[in-house]
């Protein structure tokens, strides 16, 4: 599962 910048905000 790759985390993109927007998802890293979680």
Swiss-Prot record:
One of its GO terms (biological process) is urea catabolic process. Keywords: Cytoplasm, Hydrolase. The keyword Repressor does not apply. It is found in: Cytoplasm. It catalyses: urea + 2 H2O + H(+) = hydrogencarbonate + 2 NH4(+). GO terms for cellular component: cytoplasm. Pathway: Nitrogen metabolism; urea degradation; CO(2) and NH(3) from urea (urease route): step 1/1. It is an enzyme of class 3 (hydrolase). GO terms for molecular function: urease activity. Its EC number is 3.5.1.5. Its main location: cytoplasm. Belongs to the urease gamma subunit family. Heterotrimer of UreA (gamma), UreB (beta) and UreC (alpha) subunits. Three heterotrimers associate to form the active enzyme. This is Urease subunit gamma. It comes from Morganella morganii.
């Amino acid at each position: 599962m790759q985390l993109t910048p927007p998802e890293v905000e979680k």
